[in-house]
Amino acid sequence: MIRNGHGAGGAAGLKGPGGQRTVRVWCDGCYDMVHYGHSNQLRQARAMGDYLIVGVHTDEEIAKHKGPPVFTQEERYKMVQAIKWVDEVVPAAPYVTTLETLDKHNCDFCVHGNDITLTVDGRDTYEEVKQAGRYRECKRTQGVSTTDLVGRMLLVTKAHHSSQEMSSEYREYADSFGKPPHPTPAGDTLSSEVSSQCPGGQSPWTGVSQFLQTSQKIIQFASGKEPQPGETVIYVAGAFDLFHIGHVDFLQEVHKLAKRPYVIAGLHFDQEVNRYKGKNYPIMNLHERTLSVLACRYVSEVVIGAPYSVTAELLNHFKVDLVCHGKTEIVPDRDGSDPYEEPKRRGIFCQIDSGSDLTTDLIVQRIIKNRLEYEARNQKKEAKELAFLEALRQQEAQPRGETD
């Protein structure tokens, strides 16, 4: 059990504002390749109560029901713990959510997105808590999924960058990734209602959809707090692509540099990241990276589209006290100059060694190495979802009053 200590009182029955009993909320999941969709689900869940507890499944449980995870359980525990709406993390949470689990952690109800999670034998993992009326649903974030991110890594295309349209090659891959190579158990008997949810025999929950950028989403993720007197303003800059525990470890170390830190993260434009990273980087576009970083508890503010070189204007505008960089190589600006020349001149620059060796490149290498396993995992997952939808259709089609 890992407590963050940033939320409301965690004890069962503890009185919250106005003398009301604290409402404790439970979420659980794999939280593999954590992205802003996961963060948004946890944000919505936290808004339904006062204290959010998140259970994270083990590698063994995930492999049994879905297939191999990209990240280890220890990495996944740390990532969830870093999300600012999470008050407590429960490692090794059971894959099937039961009333026993909710009662053990004194939770009033659990929250899950409006998609389906199935066991290895095709059963709804939330069936028991749904029947007991201790289940709440929140909206799934459209336009981001592990499937989509894996597809971007495997195809060397820049179609996902903010200024470009999706290529036909990427769309073809996105449409076929995880699609069963054989007819699904549903065959051609899917009802029109179900068929509308899964065109082309695809599950409505496993696949790729378009993410629509809105200012409201940024507002929901942002803290909205200005630096206060006595706080130390620390500036960091980079791509923060596929926001991962390497970034979290770095930001956590930066956060420790001051008694009252106010950390500002400057995110570079997609084209700038591609200049110094090459290939098809960044994997996530600027808007997606912004939401991912805003969800981190160690970050107070984000500069969207920050200049590559840290300028005097930027330092003066934000009244920056300290500028930090990790142990990754510092690539010169387009004109060959040092991007940290100004903070170095002022004597406010320092490099941080977080102790983590994980990089975005290493994550992509993991995916490419295990490509066939991940594709097989999605094929298996989608086949189960389609079978579940067909079972629902048959149940709805059964004449009322008919018994087995």
Curated annotation (Swiss-Prot):
Pfam families: CTP_transf_like. It comes from the Eukaryota. Residues 173-201 are annotated as: Disordered. Keywords: Lipid biosynthesis, Lipid metabolism, Nucleotidyltransferase, Phospholipid biosynthesis, Phospholipid metabolism, Phosphoprotein, Transferase. InterPro entries: CCT (IPR041723), Cyt_trans-like (IPR004821), Ect1/PCYT2 (IPR044608), Rossmann-like_a/b/a_fold (IPR014729). The modification Phosphoserine is found at S356. GO terms for biological process: phosphatidylethanolamine biosynthetic process. It catalyses: phosphoethanolamine + CTP + H(+) = CDP-ethanolamine + diphosphate. Pathway: Phospholipid metabolism; phosphatidylethanolamine biosynthesis; phosphatidylethanolamine from ethanolamine: step 2/3. One of its GO terms (molecular function) is ethanolamine-phosphate cytidylyltransferase activity. The modification Phosphothreonine is found at T359, T360. GO terms for cellular component: cytoplasm. CTP binds at residues 239-240, 247-250, 277, 325-328, 354-358. Coiled coil: none annotated. Residues 189-201 have a biased composition (Polar residues). Its EC number is 2.7.7.14. Belongs to the cytidylyltransferase family. Ethanolamine-phosphate cytidylyltransferase that catalyzes the second step in the synthesis of phosphatidylethanolamine (PE) from ethanolamine via the CDP-ethanolamine pathway. Phosphatidylethanolamine is a dominant inner-leaflet phospholipid in cell membranes, where it plays a role in membrane function by structurally stabilizing membrane-anchored proteins, and participates in important cellular processes such as cell division, cell fusion, blood coagulation, and apoptosis. This is Ethanolamine-phosphate cytidylyltransferase. It comes from Rattus norvegicus (Rat). The gene is Pcyt2.
